Amino acid sequence: MSFDIAKYPTLALVDSTQELRLLPKESLPKLCDELRRYLLDSVSRSSGHFASGLGTVELTVALHYVYNTPFDRLIWDVGHQAYPHKILTGRRDKIGTIRQKGGLHPFPWRGESEYDVLSVGHSSTSISAGIGVAIAAAKEDKQRRAVCVIGDGAITAGMAFEAMNHAGDIKPDLLVVLNDNEMSISENVGALNNHLAQLLSGKLYSTLREGGKKVFSGVPPIKELLKRTEEHIKGMVVPGTLFEELGFNYIGPVDGHDVLGLVSTLKNMRDLKGPQFLHIMTKKGRGYEPAEKDPITFHAVPKFDHTSGVLPKSSGGLPSYSKIFGDWLCETAAKDNKLMAITPAMREGSGMVEFSKKFPDRYFDVAIAEQHAVTFAAGLAIGDYKPVVAIYSTFLQRAYDQVIHDVAIQKLPVLFTIDRAGIVGADGQTHQGAFDLSFLRCIPDMVVMTPSDENECRQMLYTGYHYSDGPCAVRYPRGSGTGATLEPLASLPIGKGVVKRQGEKIAILNFGTLLPEAAAVADKLNATLVDMRFVKPLDTALILQLAGEHDALVTLEENAIMGGAGSGVNEVLMAHRRAVPVLNIGLPDYFIPQGTQEEIRADLGLDAAGIEAKIRDWLA
């Protein structure tokens, strides 16, 4: 879409933060209004993360107005809320390409702009990076400021508290802004807090506070009285005791939609020394009523007509793998009251909404705490319950030590249901599920299964749930099934594959949901086709049989080639001294950027035509 200057006259003046800082302060509310409308118009046409950005318009404008970005470092946590930041930092006219192949990255990305200090996508990393940036600036004596913006969800993660604990110890010059959009404040309390925030962030208060500490430091009773008086004054309206105890100077909560008030408070705070904490209250979806009423649904949106306020419904075709999992979970829980389901803040995405309503006493959303989720599951297993950890492939990476140390070493029967495995699509490098087979396959006593369709997925979930000799993992992709008939549930023989087609000379060993593409190629090449089903334990006998009956083997998986299922096949052949040529097809050795799943698979040669071409080129 082209930028309409007449529709956004103030925003038209701002294509960089230098231009933003030339505006008179009185024009900032109008700029915020235009920025919010432009964001609504753009994202509704292109798709993308939506409600979070609507809630951070005023904060974004105020931060770039007060701080000398990009010299001063502004770090966004996760990045869902950073679309206004992109618009104000030279990417206004490209915002309609966000999350698309060759377009703007869905999150702040270092390779895209000097304003994007830290590439993000996963949560709770900003404060740690901010401390490092602040310490580096102090070492170089550059008078550079560091600011981190973190949401009320991300700050619940342990990594954020680890960082704040460290900051309280080493006292870097750092501002942490908590964007709190989970609760509202009344006008009276809000006005009082806004006034108090400007008072407490002012130089006079800061000078008196530090001066008083020095003067009365040798008089313990008076020093204690001053401390208690300050705590009582702040405690009347401030919920910041925790952050004060961690060593931060806490200011807030303040109205995050009052851009002029934010500018005043941030100007006061900019030159304060040591770790500072600004708590702002915002409304997710601000300015667009449907998103304000239902911020979860409008968190990320497809293309839609924003004048109607209605998102397009799904075509109602084949069920997604997430729904297949959710249905199995409810079905199993109805028969077994030992089942306990755990998710780290991914209820909707993992297909657990219905389960959470039907079995609330057995549903545990542990928030953004993947490490805790896994060890919590270990404890449930020790207590003779049957935990199911529903987690995205990319987020399981964050709990790798817990999978090994707290579950696998102890052979605890925990079932990991790994959603978004393989190519995810529009969220790009940080969200592709490229590595789970590689990092799980090397763990002793771990069973790893790769279903080829929704029926096999159900059978594997059943198999893993009833397996008692250690942990199991079932990995499945984002997207819909194939329309396979759902058969009665039964346990599969552990570590056994199935020959789907008998051919000659070449055998294709498929791991996962690329089976339809593999079948099309096998028909063209008259190749044997095998649904391997298990990455660990591998069907060694079948691999050796195929090696003896064919001139060459081809392995196929939607996981990194390095260390993946194909590597396991290679290891079997080498261990048994079978000198048969093997072609490993999978994800290449680089981080895969955004695009649709179809676009990415075509680019990587993982559609039927690409797989056939790879095999023919290899055989030539």
Swiss-Prot record:
Note describing how the cofactor binds: Binds 1 Mg(2+) ion per subunit.
Cofactor(s) needed for function: Mg(2+); thiamine diphosphate
Keyword Transferase: yes
Organism classification: Bacteria, Pseudomonadati, Pseudomonadota, Gammaproteobacteria, Enterobacterales
Organism: Klebsiella pneumoniae subsp. pneumoniae (strain ATCC 700721 / MGH 78578)
Name the record gives this protein: 1-deoxy-D-xylulose-5-phosphate synthase
Assembly notes: Homodimer.
GO MF annotation list: 1-deoxy-D-xylulose-5-phosphate synthase activity; magnesium ion binding; thiamine pyrophosphate binding
GO cellular component, one term: cytosol
Summary of the function given for this chain in its UniProt record: Catalyzes the acyloin condensation reaction between C atoms 2 and 3 of pyruvate and glyceraldehyde 3-phosphate to yield 1-deoxy-D-xylulose-5-phosphate (DXP).
CDD domains with a match to the protein in the record: TPP_DXS (cd02007), TPP_PYR_DXS_TK_like (cd07033)
Gene behind the chain: dxs
Catalytic reactions of this protein: D-glyceraldehyde 3-phosphate + pyruvate + H(+) = 1-deoxy-D-xylulose 5-phosphate + CO2
Pathway annotation: Metabolic intermediate biosynthesis; 1-deoxy-D-xylulose 5-phosphate biosynthesis; 1-deoxy-D-xylulose 5-phosphate from D-glyceraldehyde 3-phosphate and pyruvate: step 1/1
